[in-house]
Amino acid sequence: MNTKLFKLVLTLLAFVLIFSSCDRKRSATTGWNYNDEKNGGFEYVFYEEQETGPGLVLIEGGTFSMGRVEQDVLYEWHAFPRRVTVSSFYMDETEVRNVDYREYLYWLRRVFVDYPEVYKMALPDTLVWRKKLAYNEPYVELYFRHPAYQEYPVVGVNWRQANDYCAWRTDRVNELIMVREGLLNMDPTGQTGENNFNTEAYLAGQYEGAVRDQLPDLDPNNDFRKVRMEDGILLPKYRLPTEAEWEFAALGLIGNMLAQERIFNERIYPWNGHYIRIDDRSGFKTTDVGQIRANTMRGRGDYMGMAGALNDHNDIPGPVTSYWPNDYGLYCMSGNVNEWVMDVYRPLTYEDAEDFRPFRGNVYQTQVRDEEGNIAEKDSLGRIRYRNVTDDEAFNRRNYNTADNINYLDGDYESSIDYDNEEANKDNTNSKRMYNTGKPMIGENGKPTMRGGDKMTSMIDNRQRVFKGGGWRDRAYWMSPGTRRFLDEEQSRDDLGFRCAMHRVGSARGGIE
């Protein structure tokens, strides 16, 4: 009886799905048919799910307590715990490798022959290995180029270079999708200078490429057309993860979900327990118990252990798939190398930011357009040009009224000691008002000095970007995803790399509506 009822329910569900799909062939608001060239050819795309880009892992989002989970031993007070929500997104399974970055450099040198400075600007700073009282010249010469290190994470890359890599990767992945779908041919010899595949330039009609085929156009005035964003063929942009996304993915609390919406064990690290060694046999081999889970510095002068019994097996960064992945399947979210995130650093961001998709660093831009309102000609590197939104364009908006919102609530004139000074409101993008208020003057010796009682300075400004995760030079304290540090966006370190992320469109869970 139950079996017959079950079959009947399945049959009814099948009919519902069939008829609902038929209904979607006609507009529910106008009654006009979709995808019918007889009435103009408006297209309805039967989209299933977002394709997972190369190297990415789906991170199902949700709510979590962002911030420190252990004692603030440095008394920085800049990571107060706060509950926030992160949308589902994609994250690289591993840190970007040396071989990945060399592939990027090879493409730049091959395509931008007339602009060698583009290649030079993208080169990682291999001199970060140098220490005044250490002999690290072999790493300066070999770490980035030698094939022995090609599976190791790239270091010496600053925040700006990491963002440029993400943009390049977006275009290469989408170009390959176009080739795979039979719409373009690979054209390595034809792509030089500005004539290279750029996703935005293609969508704006400013790149043709080696066309293999086109999509049929249901517009009765045309026979064929190029791919549009509405087709769902091209992927969203690769980018750096936000600080909240990175921390959420690193903790991997989905692995501690023992009941519906109940997580009984908070995590200090991307794994359970209070130690960086494996202290539980569940899910591990007996021989794994006692092994160190991450590439870190165990103590003063101890980067790898003793000969014959190396503790983390690496004296410098190790291969990106070293150690055990967390519950999202991500490798080295603690240790190996620190990782850049997208956020501008402020001590109180955790208190000020929104509780949905928190982020500090928004500078709103719009595409440059000509006098007729069309998208302006792309630049010499084949990219669509952007400019900051003007205050006039943002006037009367409720959600923002200026382009640069980096200083909002923490660095703008309202949050400074000059909040009642009308002159101070003229430049709201200068964080020195809040964090570097010392006013210099020329002293008696003719050298710049500070006025008495006015000597407050700070390293914090709009160029300071957050990095997280701890690296091979760090103690266990920095392995906790809730810890945070900052560095100028044009500086780099020998223990700092990055990985990419991507927004997920549609449903929060893959394959489930």
Which residues make up each language-model segment?
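Active-site beta-strand/loop architecture of penicillin-binding DD-peptidases
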Residues: 480, 487, 495
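Post-signal peptide N-terminal segment of mature Sec-exported envelope proteins
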Residues: 30-58
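Bacterial N-terminal signal peptides that target proteins for export
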Residues: 2-9
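C-terminal motif of bacterial Sec signal peptides marking the signal peptidase cleavage site
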Residues: 19-21
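A short glycine-rich, aromatic-capped structural motif
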Residues: 48-137, 150-173, 335, 504
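Short, P/G- and charge-enriched loop/turn segments at secondary-structure junctions
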Residues: 44-46, 76-79, 454, 484-489
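Short beta-strand-to-coil "C-cap" segments at the C-terminal boundary of structured domains/repeats
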Residues: 500-507
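Functional-site microenvironments in short loops/helix caps that host divalent-cation chemistry
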Residues: 26-36, 58-59, 65, 70, ...
